[in-house]
Design a protein with these regions (language model features):
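Extended, regular secondary-structure scaffolds
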Residues: 211-213, 223, 232-250, 372, ...
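His/Glu-based metal-binding/catalytic segments typifying zinc-dependent metallopeptidases
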Residues: 37-42, 49-51, 162, 166-174, ...
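Hydrophobic, small-residue-rich alpha-helical packing segments that form membrane-like cores
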Residues: 150-219, 225-243, 247-273, 278-280
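Non-catalytic, conformational "gating/processing" segments within enzyme and secreted inhibitor domains
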Residues: 158, 210-241, 698, 719-754, ...
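Generic recognition of flexible, low-complexity loop/linker segments
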Residues: 94, 210-214, 271-274, 317, ...
Length: 967
C-alpha cells in the first residue's frame, strides 16, 4: 500500500530530497493532529524519534526531570527502568532522550527490524502511559528528594538531575552561557534553564511536575520522525492503532514566542567559582541575535562566517583579540537550535578592566571587515568546508538519520510547513557561492553584527570560595528547614528516606521483566565483520588498503612510528600535533594554509595514538588523517607535505598563542570530563600505556604546557629547538605506514599523489628510544572548583597472568547497566557510571557527576562479592549478551572501517582472534561471569584510585589518598 493513502493520516507535502537521497513525506495524523515526517531510503540504520515542544516557565528543571522519568516504567512495560533494560539488551545503534531549551525528544536507532519495533513500542508507551502518575518515588529518585537517615542526622538533597546540574553549574562556560541566553531572551522560555538550576530544582513539587507532563505530552503536541529502509506503512498503522487513535485532538499552547529586539545592548556581570590555584581569569562574551530559524540563507551563511571570523587560524576577529592581549582562548560562533539564533564571541583568561576594550576591538574589527571586505579565499574555504560536511554526511558513531532528524527540528518546531527547510540546502549553497563574489557577507556583518543593538555583553569574574559559600548557603537553608519541623515531620522524612531506598533496592519481578520485548541470541550474527586489510607497497613504503565504495572520497592516513622519542620528548610530540596545520607552511601564511586545506579537502588532521600490542611494550603513532575527493587527493598530499617539512616552528608570537589556547582548552576538558581525567591519571600509576597517555594528554601534559607558557621568554629557543628535533625525526620514510580507504580507482589516484612525497622523504635508520617509565601509585584527590566528584578506580588483570576473554565485554555491560547503575546512579544519585576491560589488561570503573566519594569506592571494592553470587537465568543472560554485541556492532561508515582495520593491524589483532572473542561473548553464561571473580580481584588489588572534584569532599576523605592536590 502507498503510505500516502493510509486513511488515518493526511499527506501535506511529498517530494524527493536529493541532498539526502531520500523520499520525504510531511504528514499529519487526522484525529489528533500529531505531526509526522518520514525520510524513506535504503539506509538499514533505521531511526525513530518522538518529540514534544516543551516550554518551561521557570528553572526547576521540570522538562528534564520528565525526560528522565517517563522511561522509568509504563502501563505495558511496568519494569522500573525499561530504558536500562533496552540499553543492556537490545541491538540499538542509538538510544537516548534529550532535553533542549524548547523541546524534549526520545530518539532511537537499530539495524534490526524486530528490535526497532520493540524499541519503538517501549518508547511510545513510556511517553504516553508512564508510571510517573502512579509512583511518586520515580520523581524523587530522578528529580530531587530530602534525604535523612536518622532523626539526629544531617538533612540533605539528593536526586540524579539535581546532581547532574550541580556539575553543569560548576563550569564557568556553562554558567556564562546560561546567563547570556537569559539576558538575550528575557521574555521567552529561553530565559529559563530547562535542565534545571540546582538553586530552584528543589522548588519543584510533584503536582507541578505532573501538570507539566499532562500539558505537553499529548499527540497533538508531538512531532514523530521515521527514517531509513523501514516498513513505513506498518509503522504508521501501528502508531495509530496502539496509541494515537486513543486520543482526541487538543489545543495546546506550546508556541515559542519571539523576543522583541532591544534598543541598546545589555550588559551583565556574574561570578564563577574558583579556588586559589584554579583561576581561569575573566571571561567576556559579546552576543547578538542575528537571525530567525526559518531563514535558510542566513542559517548557512553564519556557519560560513563562524569559520571566516573565528574558527580559522588567524581569523580576523579572533586574531584582533589575541593581538590586543584580551584573553588566551577565543571561541564562539553561530548558536542555533532555537527560534532566534545568535552569533557570539567569548574570550577566556582576560582581565576585568579589559571589558571596554574587548567590545571596542570586536566592533572596530567588524567595521573594518565590512568596509574593506573579507578575504575571498577564506569565504570559499568556509563554503567548501560546509559543503563537504553536508555532502559527506559523516557523523562518526552517530547514525546519520538521527542527525538529519535533529536538523529537521531546527525549523519544523517553529513552523509546521517548514519541515523540509534545513534538509534541502543545495540551492541555497549555490546561491551563497555566487553571493560570496559580491559583498553579501560584508552586508550581513553590517546588518546583523554592527547596526544591531539586539545583544548582550557579559563578564564573568572568578570568585575564590564561591563553591564553599553556595554549599554553606544550601546547608543553612536545610538546617533552618529541619529546625522548623516537628518531631513527627522529621520522623516522616527518615521513614520516607528508608522507603525510597527500599524501593530502589527492590528489583523488578520476573513477570515485569518478561514484558520487555527482546531478541534472543539466535537473532545475533555470529560471524565477525572482516577487517578489509590488504597489504601493498609503494616505493618501499608499506600500504594498508581497505577496498570499498566511498562515493569517490579518499580516506588517507599517513601513520608514523614515534617510538624514537624519549619520555621527555613525547609531550613535545603532543604539542606538535596542536601546531601543525595552524602555523605558516611553505608559501602560505597560517590563515592561507587552512583556507587551502578547506578549499581542496574535507580536512587534514594531525593526531596520535598510544597502542598496546598483544606482546611487548606500548607504541606511539603520529598520523595525518586526510579526506578528499579523488580529484583533490594530490593537492591534499602536497599540502600535508608542506605541514611536515615546511612548517614555521620558529614564529614565537604564534607559538605562544597556540600554547596558551591549548592549555586553556585542556584545562576545561580535564575539569568538565573529570571521569576521563581520573581514569587516565589512575591508569598512569600502574600501566605503561596509561603513563604515556597521561604525559601526552592528561594532567601531566597540562602541567607541561603551564610550565612552557609561564617561562616562555627564557625558554622559547629551547622549545623551538625541541619541536624541530622531534619533527625532523618523525617524518621519516622508514617510520611510515600508509592506510587508505577507497575503491580501485581511488588507489590508482593515490599512487600518483604519493609518488613525489615518498621520493622527497628522508630515509634514515629508525631507532626506538628506551622508555623506563617511573610508574608510581599516587592515589590522588584532585581538587577543583566543582560541586560534585568523578571517582575513578583502575587496575590490570594481565599482571596476574590472566588472559583476555570475550566474557569480559559481557561483564562490562552488566556493570554499566546493573551493578554500578543501581548502586551509583539509582541509589547514590550519580548522573552516570561506566567501566571498561581492555585486551591489554587495563580496566577501570568510574562515576560521573557523583555526590558521593568513599561510598562509591566501597561499591568498587564489593564487586568480587557480587560476582561470586551472580546467578541469572538464560533470558537475563541473553539480554546482557545482546547488549554487549550491540556495542561491538555499531554501524561503521567507510572511514571508520578503515580506522578499525588499521588499529587491528597496529595492535597485532587478527580476524580469527576477533571471531574467537565474538564467539566467547555470544556463548557467555552465568557460570562464565562467576569465573571472572579472579579478574575483579586482580584489578582491585592494584588499588589505584583517583578522584577529581569538590575540595571539601576530597579533604573529608583524605585517608583514601596518598596526595591531595589542586588541578
Amino acid at each position: 500500500m502507498d503510505i500516502t493513502k493510509i486513511p488515518q493520516y493526511e499527506l501535506l507535502e511529498h517530494h524527493y530530497v536529493r541532498e539526502l537521497e531520500s523520499e520525504g513525506y510531511l504528514m499529519r495524523h487526522k484525529k489528533t493532529g500529531a505531526r509526522v515526517f518520514i525520510l524513506e531510503n535504503d539506509d538499514n540504520n533505521k531511526v525513530f524519534n518522538i518529540a514534544f515542544r516543551t516550554v518551561p516557565t521557570d528553572s526547576t528543571g521540570v522538562a528534564q526531570i520528565i525526560e528522565h522519568t517517563v522511561l522509568c516504567g509504563s502501563d505495558r512495560y511496568p519494569v522500573k527502568d525499561p530504558f536500562v533494560e533496552l540499553a543492556k539488551g537490545s541491538l540499538n545503534t542509538f538510544l537516548n532522550a534529550m532535553t533542549y531549551s524548547d523541546k524534549t525528544m526520545y530518539p532511537l536507532a537499530s539495524t534490526n527490524d524486530k528490535d526497532f519495533f520493540n524499541l519503538m513500542s517501549v518508547y511510545m508507551d513510556g511517553v504516553f502511559h508512564p508510571n510517573i502518575t502512579k509512583e511518586r518515588k520515580i520523581f524523587e529518585q530522578e528529580g530531587w528528594h530530602y534525604e535523612m537517615d536518622s532523626p539526629d542526622g544531617e538533612l540533605t538533597y539528593n536526586g540524579v538531575v539535581y546532581n547532574e546540574m550541580k556539575g553543569a553549574f560548576s563550569s564557568a562556560d556553562e554558567i556564562l552561557g546560561r546567563q547570556v541566553k537569559a539576558a538575550l531572551y528575557p521574555d521567552t522560555t529561553y530565559a529559563y534553564e530547562s535542565g534545571g538550576d540546582p538553586e530552584f530544582i528543589t522548588d519543584l513539587t510533584y503536582e507541578s511536575y505532573l501538570e507539566f507532563y499532562h500539558t505537553y505530552y499529548h499527540p497533538s503536541n508531538s512531532y514523530i520522525y521515521l527514517y531509513g529502509d523501514l516498513d513505513m506503512e506498518k509503522a504508521l498503522n501501528w502508531m495509530d492503532h496502539e496509541y494515537l487513535s486513543h486520543y482526541e485532538k487538543k489545543e495546546i499552547d506550546s508556541a515559542v514566542t519571539l523576543q522583541k529586539p532591544f534598543n541598546k545592548m545589555k550588559e551583565i556581570s556574574l561570578c564563577y567559582a574558583a579556588s586559589e590555584d584554579d583561576d581561569e581569569g575573566t571571561y567576556f562574551t559579546w552576543s547578538k541575535v542575528v537571525s530567525n530559524a526559518l531563514d535558510l540563507e542566513k542559517y548557512l551563511a553564519f556557519q560560513v562566517l563562524e569559520y571566516v571570523l573565528l574558527d580559522a587560524p588567524g581569523a580576523p576577529l579572533k586574531q584582533a583579540l589575541l593581538d590586543a592581549g584580551i584573553g588566551v582562548d577565543i571561541y564562539g560562533g553561530f548558536e542555533d537550535g532555537i527560534l532566534q539564533p545568535s552569533f557570539e564571541v567569548t574570550t577566556k583568561g582576560a582581565r576585568q578592566e579589559q571589558r571596554e576594550v574587548f567590545v571596542e576591538t570586536i566592533e572596530a574589527t567588524l567595521r573594518k571587515l565590512a568596509e574593506e571586505g573579507l578575504q575571498k579565499r577564506s569565504l570559499l574555504a568556509g563554503l567548501n568546508s560546509l559543503q563537504f560536511r553536508l555532502k559527506e554526511g559523516d557523523f562518526g558513531r552517530w547514525p546519520k538519520g538521527l542527525m538529519y532528524g535533529l536538523d529537521l527540528f531546527d525549523s519544523w518546531l517553529y513552523d509546521d510547513k517548514a519541515a523540509f527547510l534545513l534538509l534541502e540546502t543545495q540551492d541555497a549553497m549555490d546561491e551563497l557561492y555566487k553571493k560570496a563574489e559580491g559583498s553579501y557577507f560584508e552586508q550581513l556583518i553590517k546588518e546583523c553584527l554592527i547596526d544591531n543593538s539586539f545583544g548582550v555583553v557579559a563578564m564573568a569574574v572568578p570568585k575564590v570560595g564561591l563553591d564553599a559559600e553556595n554549599e554553606e548557603k544550601t546547608a543553612e537553608k536545610l538546617r533552618v528547614y529541619k529546625d522548623s519541623l516537628s518531631k513527627e515531620e522529621i520522623e516522616e522524612i527518615v521513614r520516607h528516606t528508608k522507603e525510597l531506598k527500599e524501593y530502589q533496592e527492590t528489583p523488578s519481578t520476573k513477570e515485569e521483566l518478561e514484558t520487555i520485548p527482546m531478541l534472543t541470541r539466535a537473532d545475533i550474527k555470529r560471524e565477525v565483520l572482516p577487517l578489509y586489510n590488504e597489504e601493498r607497497s609503494m616505493d618501499g613504503v608499506k600500504v594498508l588498503f581497505h577496498e570499498m565504495s566511498t562515493k569517490k572520497i579518499g580516506y588517507l592516513e599517513l601513520v608514523f612510528d614515534a617510538d624514537f622519542a624519549d619520555l621527555s620528548e613525547l609531550p613535545y610530540l603532543s604539542l606538535l600535533k596542536q601546531i601543525l596545520g595552524v602555523v605558516a607552511a611553505g608559501e602560505y601564511s597560517y590563515t592561507e594554509l587552512m583556507d587551502e586545506v578547506n578549499i581542496h579537502t574535507g580536512g587534514i588532521d594531525p593526531g596520535f595514538v598510544v597502542l598496546q600490542p598483544e606482546t611487548g611494550r606500548p607504541t606511539v603513532r603520529f598520523s595525518f588523517r586526510i579526506k578528499a575527493f579523488y580529484h583533490e587527493l594530490e593537492t591534499a598530499v602536497n599540502l600535508t607535505a608542506k605541514m611536515m617539512y615546511q612548517s614555521d616552528l620558529a614564529n614565537e608570537k604564534r607559538l605562544l598563542e597556540i600554547i596558551g589556547e591549548t592549555r586553556s582548552q585542556l584545562y576545561e576538558r580535564l575539569k568538565s570530563a573529570g571521569h576521563n581525567t581520573s581514569i587516565k591519571r589512575a591508569s598512569s600509576y600502574h600501566s605503561e600505556s596509561g603513563y604515556l597517555n597521561e604525559i601526552m594528554t592528561g594532567i601531566s601534559f597540562y602541567e607541561f604546557l603551564n610550565d612552557l607558557y609561564d617561562h616562555f621568554e627564557e625558554r622559547k629557543g629551547m622549545i623551538i629547538e625541541k619541536l624541530r628535533a622531534v619533527s625532523n625525526q618523525l617524518f621519516n620514510k622508514r617510520a611510515l605506514l600508509v592506510s587508505f580507504t577507497a575503491d580501485k580507482e581511488g588507489y590508482d589516484v593515490l599512487k600518483k599523489a604519493m609518488d613525489t612525497l615518498i621520493k622527497q622523504m628522508p630515509d634514515e635508520p629508525f631507532v626506538k628510544a628506551d622508555w623506563n617509565m617511573p610508574l608510581e601509585k599516587k592515589n590522588e584527590g584532585i581538587c577543583c572548583a566543582s560541586q560534585i566528584q568523578f571517582v575513578g578506580r583502575t587496575g590490570n588483570y594481565k599482571d596476574a597472568g590472566l588472559p583476555f576473554r570475550g566474557s569480559l565485554l559481557v561483564l562490562q555491560n552488566i556493570l554499566n547497566y546493573d551493578y554500578l547503575w543501581i548502586r551509583l546512579r539509582v541509589k547514590g544519585g550519580a548522573y552516570g557510571c561506566m567501566s571498561g576491560f581492555g585486551r591489554d589488561g587495563d580496566c577501570y570503573m568510574v562515576s560521573y557527576l557523583d555526590p558521593k566519594l568513599a561510598e562509591t569506592n566501597e561499591v568498587y571494592d564489593k564487586l568480587p562479592e557480587y560476582l561470586e553470587q551472580f546467578d541469572q537465568d538464560e533470558r537475563s543472560m541473553d539480554r546482557y549478551v545482546i547488549g554487549a554485541i550491540s556495542e561491538m556492532d555499531i554501524p561503521k561508515n567507510p572511514a571508520a572501517l578503515g580506522v578499525r582495520g588499521l588499529t587491528a593491524y597496529l595492535s597485532g589483532i587478527t580476524r580469527e582472534q576477533l571471531q574467537k572473542e565474538r564467539d566467547e561473548v555470544i556463548d557467555t553464561d552465568a557460570k562464565e561471569i562467576r569465573a571472572l571473580v579472579p579478574y575483579a580481584k586482580a584489578v582491585l588489588s592494584n588499588n589505584c584510585l583517583c578522584v577529581v572534584g569538590n575540595e571539601n569532599k576530597i579533604k573529608e576523605n583524605s585517608s583514601l589518598f596518598t596526595t591531595v592536590r589542586s588541578l
